[in-house]
């Protein structure tokens, strides 16, 4: 019955893998739920300001908020191109 045991063993393993994946998904959902509502708008506005001076892509900026015991950390990551191409200055007036 070694063949039968082989299939039974894989079911247990696949159930454990499925459970682990589900736990990861739930953890990500909970993390997303705890984000402030203004975070997407902040990211959009920061991208607009950066684009005034440097040509960057839509996904060049990430804004994350992390909570530790008694503090909150707002992390801003901006990926700049290798050769910085500044935008032409606009005439005021």
Swiss-Prot record:
InterPro entries assigned to the protein according to its UniProt record, in alphabetical order: MinE, MinE_sf
S-S bonds: none
Pfam families reported for this sequence: MinE
GO biological process, one term: cell division
Membrane-spanning residues: none
Key words, A-Z: Cell cycle, Cell division
Domain of life: Bacteria
Keyword Lipid metabolism applies: no
Keyword Calcium: no
Family: Belongs to the MinE family.
General function of this protein: Prevents the cell division inhibition by proteins MinC and MinD at internal division sites while permitting inhibition at polar sites. This ensures cell division at the proper site by restricting the formation of a division septum at the midpoint of the long axis of the cell.
HAMAP family, sorted: MinE
NCBIfam families referenced in this protein's UniProt entry, alphabetically: minE (TIGR01215), PRK00296.1 (NF001422)
Protein name listed in UniProt: Cell division topological specificity factor
Source organism: Methylococcus capsulatus (strain ATCC 33009 / NCIMB 11132 / Bath)
Lineage: Bacteria, Pseudomonadati, Pseudomonadota, Gammaproteobacteria, Methylococcales
